[in-house]
């Protein structure tokens, strides 16, 4: 009996060591990926300066941002990893090489992401921001440690302020919780704070994702070679070349006084024309199949993914009306390998993973396309450290809310693990139902608006009516004129 107990303890120990090694390896890979991403966007001048102290502070802040971004990427991959792990165990239930893939590993990964998300949002990112802005207390010896002391004091004051706000909010919303002791900080107040942050992230996803789904068509179109009906590409390219040469001569000339006053605007115009000319050259060199096949296929794929997403949400709305099990809820043990989380089996699970990743990409596109957050848009080798911190915080809020967002919309049946499912508002039928209806309505409205304007714009460009004088209102152009102009070009 004693030998069996020792064997069980050894097995538990080896399982824990194996899970720790897997989580560490995954995090190292994501950290390296995040490091390359931030290195591509960071402003190198902030890290190579004559002031060694500022350079050291910026490097430490960049390390914290890299950690936060890696946690955000891991949060995005939580649901895809969980869904695919379940399908792998269903396909290979007795495989010796798949014994490491179990519910304990997935549950531990969810708990670690929840812990590090809290740590990054509440402590690391505020510390990084205050650290870069600090100079040390007046009269103290200058150095990195002086900045650390000032940052620690600022962070302590901010923590007390946030804790007070959370306590007041919990007391107003739930009268009994006002009697909670401060000893319940870790068990109650921090999860309550994260619940509020998660609710904010879910609401932000509700606004950004429909807008991003409509913007995905234009963003993808700008990256691909578009087919142009009835367009003289050679003529358009010659115009762009002549315009670029003219602007280049104006920039090189320093004799006229007005150039120095309008140099910045002229330079922006030159870069825009140059980018247009490069795009035209790429289109000219593109093969016929790339010019006429890739773009339509990509648009059809985006349209199919968007339509499937909206249909899944509409179907989930009907489920909410007739089935209580459709409500999002939390669970402690995922029970992997027992049944598929999709009625279509492995194919349906693969579709769920693709839809979840597609919605995340769309939400990021919508976030950076919105007027409120365009200033945060990172630029290669020209993003300040403050912007990097803001981007990391924003992406972490969006990604940490993605599991709750996907489960609330019914994209997947995989219930939320650990503290991700301990949000009070998840149990409210009215909130969940209204959320699904708003998402379906906003997405449909954005798509209808985008497709209508895009179709009108493409028709105008295809028939050459974009060259009309500005005094002519294009909205009043009759259909007969469109057809007549198009037929004359064909002949």
UniProtKB/Swiss-Prot annotation:
Record keyword Signal present: no
Per the record, ranges on the Extracellular side are 1-20, 81-111, 174-192, 314-346, 406-427
Question: What broad class describes the main subcellular location of this protein?
Answer: membrane
> So where does this one cross the membrane?
21-41, 60-80, 112-132, 153-173, 193-213, 293-313, 347-367, 385-405, 428-448
Extract the InterPro entries matched here. LIMR, LMBR1-like_membr_prot
User: Where can this protein be found?
Assistant: Cell membrane; Endoplasmic reticulum membrane
Quote the subunit structure annotation. Dimer. Can also form higher oligomers.
Please tell me the species this chain comes from. Answer: Danio rerio
A single GO BP: negative regulation of canonical Wnt signaling pathway
Pfam families xref list = LMBR1 (PF04791)
Q: What is this protein called?
A: Limb region 1 homolog-like protein
Which residues are the signal sequence here?
A: none
Q: Can you tell me which family this protein belongs to?
A: Belongs to the LIMR family.
Record topology, Cytoplasmic segments? 42-59, 133-152, 214-292, 368-384, 449-491
């Amino acid at each position: 009996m004693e030998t069996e107990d020792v064997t069980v303890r050894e097995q538990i120990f080896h399982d824990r060591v194996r899970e720790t090694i897997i989580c560490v390896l995954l995090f190292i890979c994501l950290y390296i990926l995040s490091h390359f991403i931030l290195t591509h966007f960071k402003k190198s001048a902030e890290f190579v300066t004559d002031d060694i102290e500022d350079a050291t502070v910026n490097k430490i802040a960049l390390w914290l941002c890299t950690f936060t971004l890696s946690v955000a990427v891991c949060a995005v991959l939580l649901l895809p990893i969980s869904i695919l792990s379940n399908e792998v165990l269903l396909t290979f239930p007795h495989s010796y090489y798949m014994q490491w893939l179990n519910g304990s590993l997935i549950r531990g990964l969810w708990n670690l992401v929840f812990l590090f998300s809290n740590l990054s949002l509440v402590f690391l990112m505020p510390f990084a921001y205050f650290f870069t802005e600090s100079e040390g207390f007046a009269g103290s010896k200058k150095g990195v440690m002086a900045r650390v002391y000032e940052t620690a004091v600022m962070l302590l004051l901010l923590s007390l302020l946030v804790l007070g706000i959370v306590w007041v909010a919990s007391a107003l919303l739930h009268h009994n919780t006002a009697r909670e002791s401060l000893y319940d900080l870790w068990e109650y107040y921090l999860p309550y704070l994260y619940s509020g942050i998660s609710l904010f992230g879910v609401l932000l996803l509700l606004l950004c994702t429909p807008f991003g789904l409509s913007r995905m068509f234009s963003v993808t179109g700008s990256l691909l070679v578009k087919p142009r009906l009835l367009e003289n590409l050679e003529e358009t390219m010659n115009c762009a070349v002549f315009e670029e040469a003219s602007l280049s001569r104006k920039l090189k000339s320093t004799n006229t006084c007005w150039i120095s006053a309008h140099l910045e605007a002229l330079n922006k115009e030159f870069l825009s024309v140059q980018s247009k000319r490069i795009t035209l050259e790429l289109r000219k060199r593109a093969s016929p199949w790339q010019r006429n096949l890739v773009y339509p296929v990509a648009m059809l794929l985006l349209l199919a993914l968007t339509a499937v997403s909206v249909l899944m949400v509409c179907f989930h709305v009907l489920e909410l009306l007739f089935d209580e099990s459709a409500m999002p809820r939390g669970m402690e043990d995922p029970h992997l390998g027992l049944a598929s989380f999709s009625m279509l089996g492995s194919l349906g699970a693969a579709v769920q993973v693709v839809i979840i990743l597609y919605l995340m990409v769309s939400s990021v596109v919508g976030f950076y396309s919105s007027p409120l957050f365009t200033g945060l848009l990172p630029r290669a080798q020209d993003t300040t450290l403050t912007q990097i911190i803001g981007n990391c915080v924003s992406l972490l809020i969006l990604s940490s809310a993605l599991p709750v967002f996907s489960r609330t919309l019914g994209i997947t049946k995989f219930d939320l693990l650990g503290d991700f499912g301990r949000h009070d508002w998840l149990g409210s039928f009215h909130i969940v139902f209204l959320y699904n209806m708003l998402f379906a309505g906003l997405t449909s409205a954005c798509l209808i608006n985008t497709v209508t304007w895009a179709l009108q714009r493409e028709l105008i460009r295809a028939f050459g009516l974009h060259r009309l004088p500005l005094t002519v209102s294009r909205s009043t152009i009759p259909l007969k004129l469109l057809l007549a102009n198009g037929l004359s070009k064909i002949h």
